[in-house]
């Protein structure tokens, strides 16, 4: 397989991953979008966390809400818990890396807020701890996961929402996660500010 064929294969794999996910996760995306819009409409906020590429996704989602997505509208309250290196390193140093998001959630989260927890495996200790901290604060968790959902899926309550990408490949899961994030932004905007499908 030459380089062009490899690139074409990766495109086809990504398209297939999205097609395979559509029917399985579309209802969960709609449910999550409605929950987020309801929370934001009630002057609540969304806290977001993830590791590595999922940390970048957390910041991407936060920026789309704080600034704008595809329509002009006021900024919406969203905080990526992945951006403050002083806080992350002090918590990791003084306590444990598993607590880097949980301690922030206990300080910033309130009942009615939403946690968007992003993990391709669902097995990251700090993401599981974040979900547990959110539950303690009376928050709903929306979990973006993949594979079998991992420990994160096992800790979710009936009020929480899991959007699990049916793939075993990290890159494909991440690609679907990005599309899910854009779907959530679109649903939030249309629910709160109108437009087709709102």
Swiss-Prot record:
The record, for SUPFAM superfamilies, names:
SIS domain
Q: What class of enzyme is it?
A: isomerase
Alphabetized GO MF terms: carbohydrate derivative binding; D-sedoheptulose 7-phosphate isomerase activity; zinc ion binding
List the transmembrane segments.
Answer: none
Read off the Pfam families from this record: SIS_2
Could you give one GO CC term from the UniProt record?
Answer: cytoplasm
Main localization of the protein described in the UniProt heading: cytoplasm
Location of this chain's protein in the cell: Cytoplasm
Q: Name one GO biological process term.
A: carbohydrate metabolic process
Q: Would you identify the family this protein belongs to, as annotated?
A: Belongs to the SIS family. GmhA subfamily.
NCBIfam families found in the cross-reference section = PRK13936.1 (NF010546)
What does this gene product do? Catalyzes the isomerization of sedoheptulose 7-phosphate in D-glycero-D-manno-heptose 7-phosphate.
Q: How does it assemble?
A: Homotetramer.
* Name of the molecule in the record: Phosphoheptose isomerase
Species of provenance: Halorhodospira halophila (strain DSM 244 / SL1)
